[in-house]
Amino acid sequence: MQVHDNHRRPLVSLRISVTGRCNVSCIYCHRDGILRSDEEMSPEDIENICRVASDLGVKKIRLSGGEPLIRDDIVEIVEKINSIGFRDISITTNGTLLEDLSVPLRDAGLDRVNVSFDTLKPETYRFITRKDYLERVKAGIEGAVMAGLDPVKINMVILRGVNHHEIWDMFEFCRQQGAVLQIIELLKTDSCPDNGVERYHCDITPIEAELAEMADRIMTRKFMQDRKKYFIGDGEVEVVRPMDNTRFCANCTRLRVTPDGKLKPCLLRNDNLVDTKEALSSGDLEGLRELFLEAIRRRSPYYQS
């Protein structure tokens, strides 16, 4: 069955944060809008979450964090999810551990990957992440492409005064790798401090205008919040706008899950979560289904600050 919320939006995708842990400390990180927790679901818990989601019509699963590849059992998690029969399984990662895991993850059933990578300059990478992992990330991107994960997308958060001047260099890097560049406008959430947004926020409207002028073709992704994709030669660029807007909400078909098993109806809210811990611990899949339906009922037609 395909469930819809009270605003006629189908539930198509599930984004599961499998851990709050990370091996870098990005200056802008909002941890997928999720508040800190030391608890993590087991692979079996994640499998049960996904089985119920599949029964309700979910077709796509994305794993995120924290840094999902930091989990020793991430390949097992992907295998369990893949056994259910989803149309698409993807991961968002910082890429530092991707080189050695690309093939095992592909063999486990992973379809594609998004790599958070904001700069090609070692000193800027160090400033953003507090680590010296730039070459490891490059190797991870190359490994993902060679493994046949498709598409490989590079998530570049634009930061004023930090990397806003590197967009075309990153576009060329992605084009040469056979990857898609995603330009992301900095997002404010409960877990991202206001002063960070004010300091680094860069309006990407002029960037998008430049892309439109240079593009050979422009495509609008209707079920991805009317996101624009620009085709320039043999390269591709997508633009991701902040999510606290009516267009984003009107086309939202996603539910999120926190590392400790709470269903999250809205990326930007933490006041309407649905806790599945008891149902997961007892293996009560029917109870878990009812909790999913409750989370779907709590979805709003637009973001309420």
Curated annotation (Swiss-Prot):
<keyword id="KW-0547">Nucleotide-binding</keyword>
<protein>
    <recommendedName>
        <fullName>Probable GTP 3',8-cyclase</fullName>
        <ecNumber>4.1.99.22</ecNumber>
    </recommendedName>
</protein>
<feature type="binding site">
    <location>
        <position position="62"/>
    </location>
    <ligand>
        <name>GTP</name>
    </ligand>
</feature>
<dbReference type="InterPro" id="IPR013785">
    <property type="entry name" value="Aldolase_TIM"/>
</dbReference>
<dbReference type="Pfam" id="PF04055">
    <property type="entry name" value="Radical_SAM"/>
</dbReference>
<feature type="binding site">
    <location>
        <position position="15"/>
    </location>
    <ligand>
        <name>GTP</name>
    </ligand>
</feature>
<dbReference type="InterPro" id="IPR050105">
    <property type="entry name" value="MoCo_biosynth_MoaA/MoaC"/>
</dbReference>
<keyword id="KW-0342">GTP-binding</keyword>
<keyword id="KW-0501">Molybdenum cofactor biosynthesis</keyword>
<feature type="binding site">
    <location>
        <position position="28"/>
    </location>
    <ligand>
        <name>S-adenosyl-L-methionine</name>
    </ligand>
</feature>
<keyword id="KW-0408">Iron</keyword>
<comment type="function">
    <text>Catalyzes the cyclization of GTP to (8S)-3',8-cyclo-7,8-dihydroguanosine 5'-triphosphate.</text>
</comment>
<keyword id="KW-0949">S-adenosyl-L-methionine</keyword>
<dbReference type="InterPro" id="IPR000385">
    <property type="entry name" value="MoaA_NifB_PqqE_Fe-S-bd_CS"/>
</dbReference>
<dbReference type="GO" id="GO:0051539">
    <property type="term" value="F:4 iron, 4 sulfur cluster binding"/>
</dbReference>
<dbReference type="InterPro" id="IPR010505">
    <property type="entry name" value="MoaA_twitch"/>
</dbReference>
<dbReference type="InterPro" id="IPR006638">
    <property type="entry name" value="Elp3/MiaA/NifB-like_rSAM"/>
</dbReference>
<feature type="binding site">
    <location>
        <position position="116"/>
    </location>
    <ligand>
        <name>S-adenosyl-L-methionine</name>
    </ligand>
</feature>
<feature type="binding site">
    <location>
        <position position="22"/>
    </location>
    <ligand>
        <name>[4Fe-4S] cluster 1</name>
    </ligand>
</feature>
<comment type="pathway">
    <text>Cofactor biosynthesis; molybdopterin biosynthesis.</text>
</comment>
<dbReference type="GO" id="GO:0006777">
    <property type="term" value="P:Mo-molybdopterin cofactor biosynthetic process"/>
</dbReference>
<feature type="binding site">
    <location>
        <position position="26"/>
    </location>
    <ligand>
        <name>[4Fe-4S] cluster 1</name>
    </ligand>
</feature>
<dbReference type="GO" id="GO:0061799">
    <property type="term" value="F:cyclic pyranopterin monophosphate synthase activity"/>
</dbReference>
<dbReference type="InterPro" id="IPR013485">
    <property type="entry name" value="MoaA_arc"/>
</dbReference>
<keyword id="KW-0479">Metal-binding</keyword>
<dbReference type="Pfam" id="PF06463">
    <property type="entry name" value="Mob_synth_C"/>
</dbReference>
<feature type="binding site">
    <location>
        <position position="29"/>
    </location>
    <ligand>
        <name>[4Fe-4S] cluster 1</name>
    </ligand>
</feature>
<keyword id="KW-0004">4Fe-4S</keyword>
<feature type="binding site">
    <location>
        <position position="153"/>
    </location>
    <ligand>
        <name>GTP</name>
    </ligand>
</feature>
<comment type="similarity">
    <text>Belongs to the radical SAM superfamily. MoaA family.</text>
</comment>
<feature type="binding site">
    <location>
        <position position="92"/>
    </location>
    <ligand>
        <name>GTP</name>
    </ligand>
</feature>
<feature type="binding site">
    <location>
        <position position="266"/>
    </location>
    <ligand>
        <name>[4Fe-4S] cluster 2</name>
    </ligand>
</feature>
<feature type="binding site">
    <location>
        <position position="252"/>
    </location>
    <ligand>
        <name>[4Fe-4S] cluster 2</name>
    </ligand>
</feature>
<dbReference type="GO" id="GO:0005525">
    <property type="term" value="F:GTP binding"/>
</dbReference>
<feature type="domain" description="Radical SAM core">
    <location>
        <begin position="6"/>
        <end position="228"/>
    </location>
</feature>
<dbReference type="GO" id="GO:0046872">
    <property type="term" value="F:metal ion binding"/>
</dbReference>
<feature type="binding site">
    <location>
        <position position="249"/>
    </location>
    <ligand>
        <name>[4Fe-4S] cluster 2</name>
    </ligand>
</feature>
<feature type="binding site">
    <location>
        <position position="66"/>
    </location>
    <ligand>
        <name>S-adenosyl-L-methionine</name>
    </ligand>
</feature>
<dbReference type="GO" id="GO:0061798">
    <property type="term" value="F:GTP 3',8'-cyclase activity"/>
</dbReference>
<feature type="binding site">
    <location>
        <begin position="254"/>
        <end position="256"/>
    </location>
    <ligand>
        <name>GTP</name>
    </ligand>
</feature>
<dbReference type="InterPro" id="IPR007197">
    <property type="entry name" value="rSAM"/>
</dbReference>
<keyword id="KW-0411">Iron-sulfur</keyword>
